[in-house]
Design a protein with these regions (language model features):
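Reductase modules of NAD(P)H-dependent flavoproteins
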Residues: 2-84, 95-116, 320, 325-434
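Ferredoxin-reductase
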Residues: 148-276, 336, 362-366
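Fe-S ferredoxin-like electron-transfer domains
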Residues: 32-38, 108-170, 190
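Cysteine-centered iron-sulfur cluster-binding motifs in ferredoxin-type domains/subunits
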Residues: 80-89, 122-126
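Residue-level marker of beta-strand positions
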Residues: 90, 132, 179, 276-279
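A short, basic/flexible loop-to-alpha-helix module at the beginning of a structural domain
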Residues: 270, 283-297
């Protein structure tokens, strides 16, 4: 009996110890929760905050979101080609007060000098308190509209000319070479079912079938934003025209055939499904890739692929609107083959109308289709053609203004060629959205 009593006493003592321990743990937990709630109430701004922009515009807004999203909700549209993921580095603002310390994700986009000048990425800065920021004044002129698609046809095998109309009565003031942004909603699409084959065109459908593009599918799980250079120039009216290349997955390594199991580009897939009458959200204008108008220097445009867009806008404005005849102007465009070249007739007609404008077509290799059509071209990569046919015997390549937009490898090759000729980097102007 004594032994049993001792066991009961021991068990009771153990339970008492456990109960006391659990009680103390619960009390400590409740105290910590209370401290956190008090800290949140007094240290974290959960109500409205005031954002002072450029010392002359103030907005009162809710806290909690990124500065990029907060500004957009209040009608101030920062550029963000990556949709706020911190990779493009375009949503630059100066944060003079509020915003906390710069994050590692931001530091890669700024020099030490820029960091000392308070430059930040709007997509990485959380709005938690009153802020004082600085932005490019031109950003305040950016507008956002619901636009209507009026045309979306292929102009090359993998490139669409995408045109939308601004709402009635709306107008966008822009300088040729600017770009626009398009909002990409959540969607799920099947290339075979959701892309209108009549808008691809009979000329390009065989290539689409041969490459198996209609077997692709795409899904976007969250809204995002993408940037595209505008191909239109101001005199063409209240519309936005883009040239969009379909971003296919990489091909499988040889001898395999077909695409790798990677989703195609979200933005281009979405745009390729759009039909006349559809509505899209666009904003603009953005960018500083503009011609130098108060100059008499020779101008050379260098493009490839969908990089045609801003170069067409600049060239058409310099000729059709400004009627520039006192500057030598050359446009070198590179493509794999003739069926990848678009707006060819426009530039050939400009040559006839303006003796100071010259169009030069470079095709990667001899092209029987171009030969049969009587189209003048030079075989070779565009940087080689520029050097061999023009700059090699030019008196002063360093005095030319260069405007370039196209695939990365093309740009790198042109940069190297120009550097070998002593051209200063400041004479080379780029558009990063080709």
């Amino acid at each position: 009996m004594t032994s049993f009593t001792n066991i009961l006493l021991a068990v009771n003592a153990t339970w008492l110890t456990l109960s006391v321990g659990v009680t103390i743990f619960l009390i400590i937990t409740l105290v910590l929760v209370a401290i956190l709630l008090v800290a949140k109430k007094y240290l974290v701004h959960s109500g409205d905050v005031e954002i002072d922009i450029n010392n002359n515009k103030k907005i009162t807004t809710a806290s909690g979101k990124t500065l990029l999203a907060t500004m957009s909700e209040n009608g101030v549209f920062l550029s963000s080609a990556c949709g706020g993921k911190g990779s493009c580095g375009q949503c630059k603002v100066q944060v003079f007060e509020g915003g906390g310390e710069i994050l590692p994700t931001e530091q890669v986009h700024f020099s030490r000098k820029e960091q000392k000048e308070h430059w930040r990425l709007g997509c990485q800065v959380k709005v938690k308190e009153d802020m004082k920021i600085g932005i490019d004044p031109s950003v305040l002129d950016v507008k956002e509209w619901e636009c209507e698609v009026i045309s979306n046809k292929n102009v090359a095998t993998f490139i669409k000319e995408f045109i939308v109309a601004l709402p009635p009565g709306e107008h966008m003031n822009f300088i040729p070479g600017s770009y626009a942004q398009i909002k990409i909603p959540e969607f799920e699409m099947d290339y075979d079912k959701d892309i209108d084959k009549s808008l691809i065109g009979e000329e390009y459908l065989p290539a689409w079938n041969n490459y198996g593009l209609f077997g692709l599918k795409c899904k976007n799980t969250e809204p995002t934003i993408r940037a595209y250079s505008m191909a239109n120039y101001p005199a063409e009216g209240d519309r936005i025209m883009l040239t969009v290349r379909i971003a296919t997955p990489p091909f499988k390594p040889k001898p395999q055939v077909g695409f790798m199991d990677v989703m195609p580009g979200i933005a281009s897939s979405y745009i390729f499904t759009l039909k006349p009458g559809d509505k899209v959200i666009m904003s603009g204008p953005y960018g500083d890739f503009h011609p130098i108008f108060d100059s008499k220097a020779e101008m050379m445009w260098i493009g490839g692929g969908a990089g045609m867009a801003p170069l067409r806008a600049q060239i058409m404005h310099m000729t059709k609107t400004l009627h520039t005849t006192d500057r030598e102007m050359h446009y070198f465009y590179g493509a794999r083959a003739l069926n990848e070249v678009f707006y060819l007739e426009d530039f050939l007609n400009l040559e006839k109308e303006y003796p100071n404008f010259h169009f030069h077509l470079a095709l990667d290799r001899p092209d029987p289709a171009a030969d049969a059509a009587g189209v003048k071209y030079t075989p070779g990569f565009v940087h080689q053609v520029i050097y061999e046919t023009y700059l090699k015997n030019h008196d002063a390549p360093e005095d030319i203004e260069y405007y370039m937009c196209g695939p990365g490898p093309m740009s790198k090759a042109v940069e190297g060629m120009l550097d070998s000729l002593g051209v200063d980097p400041s004479s080379i102007h780029y558009d990063n959205f080709g």
